[in-house]
Amino acid sequence: MTKKRTVKRKVKEPEPTKEQPSVSEQSENEEDEDLLQAVKDPGEDTTDDEGIDQEYQSDSSEDLEFESDEEGNYLGRKVSNEAEEGEDDQDEDDDEDEDEGEDEDDDSDDDSEESDANEASATPKDDQPSSSKAAAAQTKEPIIQIIPRDPSKPEYEESDTSDEEDIRNTVGNIPMHWYDEYKHIGYDWDAKKIIKPPKGDQIDDFLRKIEDPNFWRTVKDPMTGQEVLLTDEDIALIKRVNSSRIPNPEHDEYAPWIEWFTSEVEKMPIKNVPDHKRSFLPSVSEKKKVSRMVHALKMGWMKTTEEVEREKQQKRGPKFYMLWETDTGREHMRRIHDPVSAPKRDLPGHAESYNPPPEYLFDEKETKEWLKLKDEPHKRKLHFMPQKYKSLRAVPAYSRYLRERFLRCLDLYLCPRAKRVKLNIDAEYLIPKLPSPRDLQPFPTVESLVYRGHTDLVRSVSVEPKGEYLVSGSDDKTVKIWEIATGRCIRTIETNDVVRCVAWCPNAKLSIIAVATGSRLLLINPKVGDKLLIKKTDDLLAESPNLDIIESERIKTAVQWSNAEPDEQEKGVRVVITHFKPIRQVTWHGRGDYLATVMPEGANRSALIHQLSKRRSQIPFSKSKGLIQCVLFHPVKPCFFVATQHNIRIYDLVKQELIKKLLTNSKWISGMSIHPKGDNLLVSTYDKKMLWFDLDLSTKPYQTMRLHRNAVRSVAFHLRYPLFASGSDDQAVIVSHGMVYNDLLQNPLIVPLKKLQTHEKRDEFGVLDVTWHPVQPWVFSTGADCTIRLYT
């Protein structure tokens, strides 16, 4: 059963004018159209109650009637030409319905016909603006007056909904800049795009700023892109927050204090029970106990404290001290008669002040060094980092207080105290007397040439036996041959992979370069120098010897010999030795017929020895005793040096047995070099150390040198002069004097001479390789800055 409720509005037709409608009138027309559309389509969700009470414009004076059911849902409207006749007819119809009790079906049919007629006649015209005022008719049926919502109150304050805000854009809590590239800003409840409002230029903003009095209180809603006008309450709230006051003006900051719990301590008994009668009588049990004690005293069973102490002294007997006693006894007596007081703590210095002078504060370099010694705090100069505060009030609590108190207690409790005679020793007496560097010349002191041409890290460098040419390998997959005297690049050979190591054959009668690129070892004829020597080298590498020896499958799967392809033959490549794993290092024997390669990932086949004249290879080890880093041939004896991560093993190739194992006590070995006489070995490590081993003296280092600040990557001995050099990631090449005497009773003389630091650091890498000129006291270094530098 539906009831008809009417809201009637009288509309007067305005006088026609030739002026264009203003912006406010156009907005009213748009609102009227929305209102009429909402009334016309009752199926749509219309939640804006405000629009019903707004004035709308029409071209005729008509009355609107809204129909609603018992729940208040609007079903339609109807329009009559004359307001009074429509009201009377409506009243009569309602009276007849109530008195006669007609069927509900007839009423619903009449209502539907009237609503259809109203829909057909209530279409407004857009081209004629008009204004109207709403007036409710005095009829018998109840008329519902639509009260506009107070904008100062929340939208759902008086309703039973749980929503707290009017959400127009349903995209959720996401960054709105995601919609910067689109024409819409989100989607409404009907899944329709919300088109962005048109944006004006700076002139429009300037005109609005001048003409619009509410421009200063207009903000933009980021969710819908619409402009929102702040109310007076919002402005007042912003002002209170900006002035650091409580946002709610009704809140009283200084309300009278209500003392819910009293501050006065009231002492009251837990139980207020009157004392029992027996509490005033003497205790019977105590009386019996006292009587037993009196009986024990009379019988002599119980003794007083003085009698007990006298009996203890009689049992202990007299004390006698021995004249000749052990040291422990004397120390015990000394602690009794001549105690040593605990040492006092050191007084705080200027660095421990809360406002120390600037020279006591750490700079960036000192701070990094202090933090690096986290695992070794005993090496720090100060156990704390000096801090500066503006005032004593800003000084926080000392975090190490409890630990220092605990350590102090341990020192007092556990550390023995003794008086020792201090020895006055001159410090200069302990320093070994070293010769002056001027007396140890010649050695390189300045940078003479820079060889530029590579575009990536230069990994390795090697010099021709005569000292005229230089070969280098880089990560840019090229091998370059240089003329040392002029710095000119003579030839560039491109490879298919990164060049890890290059080595020039030490035999002056051959012109061969061994290049380790990827898993291939290339034997290249550089075609520089004597033409007869070049031809002899080509003839040697072109001949393929007859292999009468049958190789095992273990060797065949590890390495294969082959001649170079025609395109590689043009570059100078003659022989290709293909390995099953990437090659890291290649080294030659002193005679130039044997060369060894290292593959760290090869397990028990990491080290291979190749013979050039017979074109065959052999695997010297059947078991892997560590990750092999580098290998080396002895210059005189048939010995083979193998360096793993932590140790160095020396093998006799003739007897095929282990001769000696050198203990480095380091974390990771990076390289090694042997003295030309073969009795001393120099080892570089990644933990900033250089180790000098005397092979005739011991298996432990004769001297450990910590000359670099970062990892030491390469070391090299000079073939003629008593010099050796080291290169590190700290961009420095340190040249040192290392004299080895023929007298076995005299120790080697080691003197650091010069620090050459001209390389640039890139990606935490500095100097990657160093090598000496075979004749002159010149040293070459390669670095991560894609250059090769010559120091003379």
From Swiss-Prot:
Where does it primarily localize?
nucleus
Which Pfam family would be a valid example here?
WD40
User: Which keywords does UniProt give here?
Assistant: Nucleus, Repeat, Ribosome biogenesis, rRNA processing, WD repeat
Q: Where is the composition biased (Acidic residues)?
A: 44-53, 60-72, 82-117, 157-166
Task: Quote the biased-composition stretches of kind Basic residues, using this chain's numbering.
Answer: 1-11
MF terms per GO, please?
Answer: ribonucleoprotein complex binding
GO BP: maturation of 5.8S rRNA from tricistronic rRNA transcript (SSU-rRNA, 5.8S rRNA, LSU-rRNA); maturation of LSU-rRNA from tricistronic rRNA transcript (SSU-rRNA, 5.8S rRNA, LSU-rRNA); regulation of hemocyte proliferation
Q: Where are the WD repeats?
A: 453-494, 496-534, 578-620, 623-661, 664-703, 707-746, 762-792
Q: Where in the cell is it found?
A: Nucleus, Nucleolus; Nucleus, Nucleoplasm
Name a single GO cellular component.
nucleoplasm
- Is Repeat included in the keywords of this UniProt record? yes
Where is the stretch described as Disordered? 1-167
What InterPro entries does its record include?
Answer: BOP1/Erb1, BOP1_N_dom, WD40/YVTN_repeat-like_dom_sf, WD40_repeat_CS, WD40_repeat_dom_sf, WD40_rpt
Q: What role does it play?
A: Required for maturation of ribosomal RNAs and formation of the large ribosomal subunit.
Recorded family membership = Belongs to the WD repeat BOP1/ERB1 family.
Q: Could you tell me what this protein is called?
A: Ribosome biogenesis protein BOP1 homolog
